[in-house]
């Protein structure tokens, strides 16, 4: 949210684009969207390849009152997107297939949501970079985030990611 941070993000995005590297961006948290929207617009420029946000960030940034309307409006800023919906899963837009995909989250008893969005994004990126479709990546990401919210702390235990992946792929 600082001027230097914004400049670094803009320069990183420029470098990535010049070198045919895809750019993913996350809105981070609702406070950032409300206080740093102009900065995000500067960073986004002509658009990013993949945007991560939650439903509240999507609606706040777009000015829309439903996540579906917000997602349509966000297509102006990104090729593809993944909008997390808490215990309702995620709404994903796959630019190449030109389709929205709803992914359900496993039903769990949540005790701490700290880090769930970050884990969702990291797992989703892992999936699409390892041959999974957007739908499969979203399913895996929802499973990982759902597992995380059942415990205190922002990280899964050491073996949990491997077990989740093995379970998903079997």
What are these language model-derived features?
Residues 83, 87, 104-169:
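Conserved post-catalytic alpha-helical subdomain immediately downstream of the catalytic base
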Residues 1-102, 132, 161, 169:
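Ribokinase/PfkB-type carbohydrate-kinase core domain
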């Amino acid at each position: 949210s600082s001027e230097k941070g914004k400049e670094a993000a803009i320069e990183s995005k420029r470098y990535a684009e010049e070198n045919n590297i895809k750019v993913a961006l996350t809105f981070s948290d609702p406070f950032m969207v409300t206080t740093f929207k102009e900065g995000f617009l500067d960073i986004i420029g002509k658009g990013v390849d993949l945007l991560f946000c939650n439903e509240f960030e999507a609606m706040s940034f777009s000015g829309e009152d439903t996540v579906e309307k917000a997602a349509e409006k966000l297509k102006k800023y990104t090729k593809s997107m993944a909008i997390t919906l808490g215990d309702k899963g995620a709404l994903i837009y796959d630019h190449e297939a030109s389709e929205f995909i709803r992914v359900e989250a496993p039903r769990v008893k949540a005790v701490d949501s700290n880090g769930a969005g970050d884990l969702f994004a990291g797992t989703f990126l892992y999936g699409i970079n390892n041959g999974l479709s957007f739908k499969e990546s979203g399913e895996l990401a929802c499973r990982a985030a759902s597992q995380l919210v059942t415990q205190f702390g922002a990280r899964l235990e050491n073996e949990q990611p491997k077990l989740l992946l093995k379970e998903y792929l079997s």
